[in-house]
């Protein structure tokens, strides 16, 4: 027997004035007047016309897969999850909860807040969300919004299996690694432990629909009608401006002077430019002679945290939201009437050959450009100012966003695929197959970390590494700290390296710079991060204390939560802990050993004593980042001869970030012998081999001496 679609409140009969008679089927409480207000808004969305079609396809489709195709702003991300919850409720939630993935944690939280409001339910009870360091769910949660990378971690581990009745993969056109991987795993039918009657809903922009249709084998597609009304005609500049931030600011100020109605959405390539634009606009708008209140300038990027909800608040003043690719498809803002688009994005692209990230400034895709333009549609249509010529978009922009699985370090993904007992990650289906070189580099790195056994399967150590929500090399360093009795410090460091950057970018005032410099540690950036965290905790996690030192309060709070999660995980899998000893000479050496155990692939040597570092694994020369503690000292000493680094970024300056001095003897002692043998020919490799031979001779001599001492007493006896 097929279940019937759940009836909405107004289908039960009472009018809004009699709402006390209508009961919310999810919690058994009467609907509030707020529910009916929001229901009218929901029914006005373009997607509402497809409600019953979608529920019928979800119920009757034998393959269990439904595609939903619609433009940004059509209501896909808020309504599809609610309809899936109705479907699951009609079946008594016997197959599990409804889980909705989002490519960005901020989007998952924001949608959960909105959907809980529309459903007249309590956030954290029937509707919840799971994002890094924040699990706002409970035992009665029926609808959960989740960062897609967290869900991939759940799928790969033994935890959480069997919890999903409907799985919604939203914003598939974003092409995140986790979203593409989840689709590959589901399409390959490798999730045997999941419920057999699982429903999968893939929600996408129309531009990716043909590719998804072919990938899933022509499943039923629910097309969302286009929103009525005129679409703005883009206004193109003749040339690309030399200063994007200044051009965007002047365009916003011109709109404000004309006092055209509606909010403004500005797209810039990077968070740094977003901050500069917000600072400049906040100063300039105060001097405008306007009839009403000056515009409110709001940033929108991943580091905004909970402050992102300000973009949805009703204000008497005009809102100017400054963002980047984060808002291409997420965060629909109905009040937007004007869009200013730089046409560019700044992305990190990983090069597996040299194990480095490139900061690439590139054109957005045609799909993104169209999504940005549609933000300004309405009655009457708004405006879309493109800070680039039309030929730039036509000739240089790709049709779709680049798949991130072709641009990121795949070591963590391969580790998770191995956890799912997929012997050859290259055999897993992806919408776009990763480069063989990237997969080989990931396998090689995992092999160096002892995460794989002789057959190429996960070793016991690899299974433990896959449990941690950390990069494999950082998880290895954390496990090594158990051996070297520095777990407390390594927990702090792992959290600080994984959370958002704890330092705000200069310029700082002289007073702020002096206070920040006082937090630097002589042993290097890694110890400085530990010292910053401990000072933050001692301050009582005070936000004003952070602001006075140019520290990111939200990032430090995130690190504190993550540290607690890591500690709980180590206790659960019964790993040994150690007491705090930060600052002692022994702890300094132990911490270096733990770091080298995980990061021996990221070592560089100063070749000429001036700070030109040759990377050990390939012949690239880099300098220390300008934010490195070794460079920010007032009287810098000679650069450290050997350093371990966290990141190597190729941009304007090839730079090493988060750097600490190490002794090459530690590298010889702790790195796998075959790793040293595989290094490219260089003076650094020769020095390490000489050290290894000397240490081997010393060890042999020590053993010989010990044996002689043992034999002599035996003779005397």
From Swiss-Prot:
A motif (DEAQ box) lies at residues 170-173. Residues 699-708 have a biased composition (Polar residues). Keywords: ATP-binding, Nucleotide-binding, Nucleus. The keyword Nucleotide-binding applies. GO terms for cellular component: spliceosomal complex. ATP binds at residues 70-77. SUPFAM superfamilies: P-loop containing nucleoside triphosphate hydrolases (SSF52540). Residues 57-225 form the Helicase ATP-binding domain. This is ATP-dependent RNA helicase homolog DQX1. It comes from Homo sapiens. The lineage of its organism: Eukaryota, Metazoa, Chordata, Craniata, Vertebrata.
